[in-house]
C-alpha cells in the first residue's frame, strides 16, 4: 500500500504543477491512493480487490518497479542495456519490461558491479528513496554499463 501511495503522489505531483492533494481515504487509509492509481492507469484494477493483509505485505523489488512504472511516461534512454544482460532478470520474467526500462533510463543501476537486481527481495527504504529521486529529478539519473 505504501508503494501505491508514493506512486500516486508522484504521478499527481508531476501532473498537477507540483501539488499533491491526495489524502488518506476509507475504509482503509490507502483506499484513495489505490483508487487514484487505478483511475489514472498507474496500476491494474486487481489491486482494488487486494485484502488489507495483501496491501500491508512488504513489496518485492520487481513489483515496486511495476507500480512506479505507471507513475510517469518519460523514460528517455541514457544507457544501453541489451536484453537479458541484467544477470537475474530475463526478458520473459514478470515485470521485465519495466525493470529494463528503469535500467535504460538510469533510474536503476543494479545492486553490484554486475547490475544484479534481486527482483524477489523486499525493497528497502534507501532503494525507494533512490528510485523516487531519480524519477523526479532527471539530473539524478545514473549511467550504467553492464558487462
Describe every region a protein language model picked out.
Residues 1-62, 70-96, 108-122, 134-147:
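Feature responds to low-complexity, polar/acidic, surface-exposed segments characteristic
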Amino acid at each position: 500500500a505504501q508503494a501505491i501511495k508514493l506512486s500516486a503522489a508522484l504521478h499527481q505531483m508531476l501532473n498537477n504543477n507540483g501539488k499533491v492533494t491526495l489524502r488518506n481515504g476509507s475504509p482503509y487509509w490507502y483506499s484513495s491512493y489505490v483508487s487514484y492509481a487505478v483511475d489514472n492507469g498507474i496500476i491494474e484494477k486487481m489491486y482494488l480487490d487486494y485484502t488489507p493483509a495483501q496491501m500491508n505485505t512488504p513489496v518485492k523489488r520487481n513489483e515496486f518497479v511495476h507500480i512506479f512504472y505507471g507513475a510517469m511516461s518519460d523514460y528517455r534512454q541514457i544507457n544501453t542495456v541489451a536484453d537479458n544482460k541484467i544477470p537475474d532478470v530475463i526478458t520473459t520474467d514478470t515485470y521485465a519490461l519495466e525493470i529494463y526500462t528503469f535500467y535504460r533510463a538510469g533510474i536503476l543501476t543494479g545492486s553490484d558491479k554486475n547490475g544484479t537486481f534481486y527482483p524477489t527481495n523486499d525493497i528497502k527504504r534507501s532503494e525507494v528513496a533512490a528510485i523516487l529521486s531519480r524519477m523526479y529529478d532527471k539530473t539524478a539519473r545514473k549511467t550504467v554499463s553492464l558487462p
